[in-house]
């Protein structure tokens, strides 16, 4: 990857969430780099090495990179000036910068977003299912939640969902879809919101016909596990039969045989649940006990209903 490509990708990832705390209220899309210099310097250092340097600009601490006798500064435009004096700098180690917990957390969030964006590029360039699917217009296949310990795994992009709205579980009018309403009722049982969770689709593009689901699932599996390896969730809730078949990678006769059980798949704990579509009579009723028994606390999974260890199925 070249520097200009990294700069372009990062420019689409900056947000209030990754902005330095004292700058959050001033952050906006017209000044995306505001409050990002330290974590961006760390990421540039991850990919290109060199030195991380610190200067003062208008009495404000500012970080940039020095690579092969070249100054690299992706966030200089936040100062709205071309006259930055880079000469009087001090070298800073990664350890010195990351000792601050807030900086470390923001760095990890931005780095994760970057890695997932690079995987999205691979998905967008994939042509394995070209005659069977329509691509995501936004090339975005991950709904980034506030906490990464739980991932909701859907079947495939719905025609009226986030492939058009750009926001998982919402339509183009930003109205929660019927399946989202049911899912939120279930998440209420464990004190979470849809926005708290990461959301992925087992199939990354929109299948033009359901008969292609199995083939597309096979082709997309490598991308799914690339994403999961970066997110590192503690639990994955797979919605319905198709998503479950894709991730479990073994055959079962009836979906009811696996619902609510915990499977260890490549180090990830997967719990199949009924799809929250309100069309299904089991969308809430069939999942209620599963959610009541699921207690995600301090990033660990405890199955608390039966006062005994639940069997973990390993494949």
Label each region the model flagged:
Residues 1-115:
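A structural boundary/capping signal
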Residues 116-306, 310-313:
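A polyanion-binding, active-site-adjacent surface
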Residues 13, 19, 62, 85-88, ...:
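Intrinsically disordered, low-complexity N-terminal regions enriched in serine/proline/glycine
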Residues 111, 312-315:
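Intrinsic low-complexity, glycine/proline- and repeat-rich
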